Amino acid sequence: MYCVIMAGGRGTRFWPASRKNNPKQLLNIVGNSTMLQMTVDRFQKMKNVEDIFIVTNKDLAPKINKMINGVKKKNIIIEPSGKNTAPAIGLAALKIKSIREDAVMGVFPADHLVIGAQKFAKTVRSAIQISNKNNALVTIGIKPNFASTGYGYIQFDPQSTLDYLAGFKVKTFAEKPHEKLAKRFVSSGDFLWNGGMFVWKVSSFFSELKIHMTELNSQLEKIEKKVNANQDFSSLWQKIQPKSIDYGLMEKSDNIYVVKSEFDWNDLGSWDAVFEVSPKTKDQNVIRGEGLVIDGKNNLIESDNHFTAVLGLNNIVVVNTPDATLVIPRDKVEDIKELVSYLEKNKKSGLL
């Protein structure tokens, strides 16, 4: 399998720590390495990974090349501009196709936490086998442990199991549900979280793209020669319409299987998620860096550059950086995106 790591996102929900020039995937969110380096290391240890590619933007590429070990400079694929996930994955598929047309490629986010390396490797092996056996598009589904309204869901057919591979035919993809519907999904037993991880043969991907995303497929065909010749293709790229791989392809194809994950997973999509996975004091506070909580519980302090104190407050997130401070209730952290939008509209570029 050729591994493709998607590393072009901005991580706006992690403001003020995450910025355009140093986004979430390049931060030490958990552990001693950046999220991207942890992801690269995970795949380097897998025997069936032939090579690793990173897809990112032109602003982050030089930094990634310097910071990340284990990925060749020529394997850093640069998008001229952000076009959402479908074009980015298509660009990576062109690169891999030029190496081996019958290759299997796996697409994975750069910034998710995976616990259980052997179980993860087993799940990916099953996905590879299904993609080869059925010429199918395969996604990896996460077994839900609560009724989340923050993830999309995948419904599978329980009767369509593939021998010992824990793979099932996908019935539907569902967008992020409201709480009542999320509870119904989880209680039904035939829904999984959509973790944004995909495995397929390059040839199968382009066959499905030709059917369901005809315009994108045509544009990628025009770009292919320039990509293979290492020529500039930015003018052709600008004509591509942004679209997600879920909406553009996965929700439309009828040849999709899902493999149930056997590993522990967290997309670390917010500061609250960081709180949940981090070691805590006896009062259930998380203190990362220099900080103190008195008469308060369930707080998160992220403050590397100076001392931060919280007194008499519960369920608060405090993030300090050299030029900005965020104070927000833990149950409101999803609203950070609105704050970032405000900064953009008011041209506060120095804070972005």
How would you describe each model-predicted region?
Residues 36, 92, 111, 154, ...:
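Residue-level signal for inorganic ion chemistry
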Residues 112-114, 144, 265:
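Short histidine/acidic/glycine/proline-rich micro-motifs that form metal-
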Residues 202-352:
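Left-handed beta-helix
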Residues 2-5, 13-16, 20, 31-109, ...:
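Conserved N-terminal catalytic core of the sugar/cofactor nucleotidyltransferase
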Residues 6-7, 55, 106-109, 139-143, ...:
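Short beta-strand segments
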Residues 117-236, 257, 330:
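Conserved core of the sugar-phosphate nucleotidyltransferase
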Residues 53, 105, 171, 190, ...:
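A residue-level structural signature of the nucleotidyltransferase/glycosyltransferase Rossmann-like core
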